[in-house]
A protein has these predicted regions:
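A conserved acidic beta->alpha catalytic loop
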Residues: 158, 179, 188-198, 243
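Short, acidic, metal-binding catalytic loop of nucleotide-sugar glycosyltransferases
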Residues: 168-182
Length: 406
């Protein structure tokens, strides 16, 4: 092993187990199809080496883990087996496995977290119906002048998991240490019709429907929210509807703008994409049990390393300086990268290491036949100030007659 490779058996064993789980678990691909596809070559080398260690028990555990990648008992058993084998004196086959596993980890943007108390059982999936039964929480009072605007773009044409996540997100935002009059939450639902309006309105300060048939356009939805929100907030939080915020979320991130020159920031380094069991557990802890932050020991997550979006904080002036988000992006992929790049070039843009929990929902992401994101044809950093106004809520209204209500 070279000097860039760790020598602790526990670290190397964890790299093996993580790589096998990420390769076998379909939820890893759902967490990020782009990151998952990019790491296939390194992972396949680990899978091959795990089956050729010369130790029958290691091979059996590795095979069972690939069959049941969410089983924490197998994770712990295989980790222990590999550590014991290393402590007895590594064989050439084990050294090869560890080398390949570390190369896979070092070249992957998709990691793994398995809490010590995660069980995968005993936690029923929470539904949007259960969240609809909860009180809406404190609202803005007449005369409040919020300094922070939280914009949440949203669409759910499916079974309601995204709606479940949005309601959990909104209810967590009503439970904050920041004074209630300090921040406004705005949901922009873009669809053929306002499918979820009646459910959403009790939990948000401002709801706006913007007609948009066809594919989801996050950039346009965000711009619609920022441009058309009431008031004159000094900063904007662009927040995905699947984020479960902790209780200090608003206060902590708003305070970061008190530093001289700061125009925006990403509040996190890594995004934890929870599985369904962990999502329901985290929601239960955060909302029903009233904890300020979900305990990570009970969670299982695929960890996206340094993703660019999901939760971005910017001064309103900086947002308009770069003409908001690029509205040419349709569908999933690339718009967050582009916005972060332009913020970084045009302003002092910071990065922090807060916990970011992303609640589970089936992925709608796809790649082109060449393996690139669907928006890869859009030149990076090519969006900027223009005579055409951004955030026009009627931009797609002309398509209404061509698309029936669904």
């Amino acid at each position: 092993m070279d000097s860039l490779t760790p020598t602790a058996p526990e670290t190397l064993a964890a790299a093996v187990v993580t790589t096998l789980a990420v390769d076998a678990d379909p939820q890893a691909r759902e967490a990020s199809i782009f990151y998952w596809e990019r790491g296939q070559g390194h992972r396949k080398a680990v899978v091959e080496a795990a089956g050729n260690t010369g130790d029958a028990e290691t091979g059996r555990l590795a095979a069972e883990l690939r069959d049941r990648p969410a089983d924490p008992r197998l994770h712990h058993a295989l980790t222990r087996r590999l550590v014991l084998a290393a402590e007895r004196g590594p064989t050439p086959a084990l050294t090869t496995l560890f080398d390949r596993a570390w190369q896979a980890e070092a070249n992957s943007r998709l990691g793994y977290h398995l809490g010590r108390s995660y069980t995968a059982t005993g936690q029923a999936s929470l539904t949007s119906g259960e969240l609809r039964g909860r009180a809406g929480g404190p609202r803005l009072a007449e005369g409040d002048t919020p300094e922070v605007l939280v914009v949440i773009p949203f669409r759910d044409r499916g079974s309601g998991q995204r709606l479940r996540n949005l309601l959990a997100c909104l209810q967590a935002l009503r439970d904050q240490t920041a004074p209630r009059g300090f921040y406004r939450v705005m949901v922009v639902e873009t669809d053929e019709r306002p499918r979820r309006r009646e459910v959403i309105e009790p939990y948000t300060d401002h709801y706006l429907f913007a007609h948009k048939p066809g594919t989801f356009n996050k950039s346009w939805a965000v711009n619609v929210g920022v441009v058309n929100a009431p008031g004159s907030a000094g900063c904007v939080c662009i927040l995905d509807a699947d984020v479960l915020a902790d209780r200090d979320f608003i206060a902590r991130n708003a305070a970061r703008f008190r530093r001289p020159g700061v125009m925006g920031h990403l509040s996190y380094r890594d995004m934890w994409c929870l599985d369904e069991t962990s999502t329901s557990r985290a929601i239960d802890e955060r909302l029903w049990q009233g904890v300020g932050r979900a305990e990570t020991d009970g969670l299982r997550a695929f960890v996206l390393r340094r993703p660019p979006g999901c939760c971005v904080w910017v001064r309103t002036s900086a947002f308009h300086r770069i003409n908001g988000m690029d509205e040419r992006f349709e569908g999933w992929g690339g718009e967050d990268n582009d916005f972060a790049y332009r913020m970084d070039i045009n302003s002092a843009f910071d990065h922090y290491d807060d916990q970011l929990l992303h609640m589970y929902h089936p992925s709608s992401a796809v790649l082109r036949e060449d393996g690139e994101l669907v928006n890869a044809h859009i030149p990076a950093l090519s969006w900027g100030p223009s005579d055409v106004p951004i955030g026009d809520p009627d931009r797609f209204v002309s398509q209404a007659s061509a698309v029936p209500n669904g």
